[in-house]
């Protein structure tokens, strides 16, 4: 049995293929190609780039420029690293609504008290406050739409290998959701099937005169009425999508505020900063975030006085 297990493990390792490193120039070029691909509309309606598109359009450009032989497996490995990098950036905005982005300096911004609270829980992230991040906007463009739609990353559709690439879908952030995109399939499924009236062939009477069995004026009016009905249905569908999009945005904002420990602490008046910082650390250590934010302001104050 042991030899069989070892053989199975060996075969799994062989499936992964040889490891191929990525140079800085290759990483930069892949990001640039993906950004250009998005602008060209190479994503499908789910917000992802399919395996076929990656293999036929993206990797050939990269391999030709650097005279390398990157495969789809290598691409997935690099995408995993890129999404891990982006998740660190996105975590700032989930920690507190006080974080922002300066597109000129390419730096993350926040008030001093927000940075202090964040760095208390992330002592190894001091560089996030002072460093510049040239690739943030590109990574945001690459990953935000796919994440918001519930997909893992580009090229991770049904034809991808789950063993090769395992993603944690913790991040559901981002308001850059293409809710206003209406595709033909959705319209066809939502609208009733309208059948235009069949025009019957003319009949010939005994005198040889041809007369239409359907009055042409009435037929044209009916067709026009049906076309107006279809147009009205499309307009109603668009309005419904807009309303749903607005509700989803408001819901995410509400959830974001509800789950923000630091904002919940700042609602408590007359607390010194060092007590606030200690409270943040204590709450995260005890994994009591959900309980704490569900308390009233008075209950939060009582909890802090008792536990800090």
Curated annotation (Swiss-Prot):
Bias (Basic and acidic residues): 206-221
Region (Disordered): 158-221
A Pfam family recorded for this sequence: Myb_DNA-bind_3
UniProt protein name: Uncharacterized protein At2g29880
Organism (species): Arabidopsis thaliana
């Amino acid at each position: 049995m042991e030899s069989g297990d070892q053989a199975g493990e060996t075969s799994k390792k062989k499936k992964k293929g040889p490891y191929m490193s990525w140079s800085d120039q290759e990483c930069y070029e892949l990001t640039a190609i993906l950004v250009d691909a998005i602008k060209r509309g190479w994503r499908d309606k789910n917000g992802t780039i399919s395996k076929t598109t990656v293999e036929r359009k993206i990797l050939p450009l990269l391999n030709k420029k650097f005279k390398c032989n990157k495969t789809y497996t290598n691409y997935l490995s690099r995408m995993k690293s890129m999404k891990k990098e982006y998740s660190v950036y996105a975590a700032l905005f989930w920690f507190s609504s006080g974080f922002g982005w300066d597109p000129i300096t390419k730096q993350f911004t926040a008030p001093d008290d927000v940075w202090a609270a964040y760095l208390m829980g992330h002592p190894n992230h001091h560089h996030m406050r002072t460093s510049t991040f040239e690739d943030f906007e590109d990574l945001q463009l690459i990953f935000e739409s796919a994440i918001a739609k519930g997909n893992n990353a580009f090229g991770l559709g049904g034809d991808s290998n789950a063993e090769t690439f395992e993603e944690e879908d913790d991040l559901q952030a981002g308001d850059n959701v293409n809710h206003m995109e209406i595709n033909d399939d959705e319209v066809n499924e939502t609208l009733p099937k309208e059948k235009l009236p069949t025009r019957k062939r003319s009949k010939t009477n005994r005198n040889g005169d041809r007369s239409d069995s359907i009055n042409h004026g009435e037929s044209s009016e009916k067709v026009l009425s049906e076309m107006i009905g279809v147009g009205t249905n499309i307009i109603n569908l668009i309005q419904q999508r807009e309303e749903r999009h607005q509700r989803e945005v408001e819901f995410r904002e509400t959830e974001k505020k509800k789950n923000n420990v630091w904002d919940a602490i700042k609602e408590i008046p007359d607390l010194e900063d060092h007590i606030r910082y200690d409270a943040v650390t204590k709450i995260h250590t005890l994994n009591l975030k959900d309980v704490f934010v569900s308390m009233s302001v008075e209950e939060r104050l009582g909890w802090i006085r008792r536990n800090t």
